[in-house]
From Swiss-Prot:
Name of the protein described by the UniProt record: Hydrolase acrC
Higher taxonomy: Eukaryota, Fungi, Dikarya, Ascomycota, Pezizomycotina
Family annotation (Gene3D superfamilies): acylaminoacyl peptidase (1.20.1440.110), alpha/beta hydrolase (3.40.50.1820)
Induction line: Expression is positively regulated by the acurin A cluster-specific transcription regulator acrR.
Null mutant phenotype: Abolishes the production of acurin A.
Keywords: Hydrolase
UniProt keyword annotation of Hydrolase present: yes
Length: 428
């Protein structure tokens, strides 16, 4: 497979931006202009190059708006939002860096300008009440409603009501990035979509200091409450056709949400089954087992990880980002937090239709360790109501979160969702 960078980490994150181009999240030429400016592993050069590209795209949007070209303006603003998001990504080893919040605020602001100019949908801002031990907060969300009419409906369904996808982010995504992964493909198919930023994600992490939590059903219960008590009363949403969708750690979160009886279908894309086991499998047995048995102290564990992180930028970023989103101070504490992120014993609560995907070529959540155990653990979902797909090759969905193959993923996902919701589309 062709690689833009020698390291898998920088290659994947560059491809993550570039692959959003068909959905409006990037322009190929703008991405290629960034490439020679960023040496492999150089987080500062990455930040500078993507920030400059974001500012340039935002400038193009301003110019288009002055001339009355709202289509060009919307596209430029949406690209700028994704570039601002990408710019700060590799700076997460220093959570106190003020550029993290500044870049995210720019990403959110310019994204709002972009989606408000779209003529394909109506975007409604949503606030989701959320409570945790440290106090109450409001999670930001966006409800996307297609303007071109509802999806074709099956027998017994009201034609003026829309099926709804609730899309959750994961470990390092943002609500704005989710637009390119979900709503951009769902809206033309007649689906309404609700995205939201949860604790430990996007602006909620950087501005509000909310931390990630393993019991994501606590979050999605609040989201579903808002859908049921507010959104379905004000907008044409069909409460009998609600699905949850997530990718990577978001796929794990989607599975947690799917235990709610108000959810009728779940799409879990390339999720983890046990996050600790995934991380454990990447460490020498003597080291991780020695720490688990307490023969090796936290101090020694932290010293070794920090020493190795000095040589490996990816390791430094993974533990740095983890400490930030979990709200802990050391690698050992990260490992303890990860032990809470597993689906073992939980998936028996899921009874709705479920589409489970895996990625054969990922270096994160491999199918053997994650996808297959998830599918097998869905014992209370009838076989005819669950489906398994393992993507292979970059063109066939073989990379994590189906990066580089969203069109293939969307085709399979929406055919399956249409079946679950009895949506009949005409043939040509």
């Amino acid at each position: 497979m062709f690689k833009f960078y020698p390291s898998d980490f920088f290659h994947f994150e560059f491809l993550r931006v570039l692959a959003s181009a068909p959905a409006g999240g990037a322009e190929t030429g703008e991405c290629l202009a960034v490439l020679p400016q960023v040496p492999d592993g150089d987080a500062e050069a990455w930040y500078r190059a993507w920030t400059a590209q974001a500012q340039q795209a935002r400038g193009l949007g301003d110019e288009a708006l002055v001339s009355g070209d709202t289509v060009a303006a919307s596209g430029a603003y949406l690209r700028a939002s994704n570039y601002f998001r990408a710019s700060e990504f590799f700076l997460h080893t220093r959570p106190d860096d003020p550029r993290l919040l500044a870049a995210m605020e720019n990403s959110v602001a310019v994204f709002d300008k972009g989606v408000d100019l779209l003529d394909t949908c109506t975007v409604v801002r949503v606030e989701i009440p959320y409570e945790e031990e440290k106090g109450a907060a409001r999670l930001p969300g966006r409800l996307y409603l297609p303007r071109s009419g509802a999806a074709q409906t099956g027998q017994g369904q009201s034609e003026d009501k829309l099926p709804l996808l609730i899309m959750t982010g994961g470990f390092d995504s943002t609500q704005e990035e989710l637009y390119f992964f979900g709503p951009a493909a769902a809206l033309p198919r007649g689906y309404a979509v609700l995205t939201f930023e949860g604790p430990g994600q996007g602006i909620c992490l950087r501005r509000d200091g909310l931390r990630l939590r393993p019991d994501w059903e606590h979050v999605t219960t609040k989201v579903l409450d808002v859908v049921e008590s507010q959104l379905a009363k004000d907008y044409p949403i069909d409460l009998e056709r609600v699905a949850v969708v997530g990718a990577s750690l978001g796929g794990y979160f989607a599975l947690r949400a799917a235990a709610d009886p108000r959810v009728r279908a779940c799409v879990s894309c390339d999720a983890c089954y046990d996050l600790f086991d995934v991380t454990r499998s990447r460490m020498p047995g003597w080291f991780i087992n020695g720490w688990l048995s307490r023969r090796l102290s936290d101090g020694f564990f932290n010293w070794v990880v920090n020493k190795l992180a000095g040589w490996s930028f990816q390791l430094r970023w993974e533990f740095g980002h983890s400490m930030w989103v979990y709200g802990v101070e050391s690698p050992a504490e990260v490992m303890r937090c990860m032990q809470q992120y597993h689906a073992r014993g939980y998936l028996q609560k899921v009874k709705c239709s479920t589409f489970v995907t895996g990625a054969a070529d990922t270096f994160y959540f491999t199918p053997k360790q994650n996808t297959e155990p998830i599918f097998e653990a869905l014992g209370h979902v009838p076989l005819q109501k669950k489906r398994l797909w393992i993507g292979k090759g970059v063109e066939g969905g073989g990379l994590q979160a189906k990066i580089g193959a969203w069109a293939v993923f969307h085709q399979k996902m929406f055919v399956w969702l249409d079946e679950q919701f009895e949506i009949k589309r005409g043939t040509i």
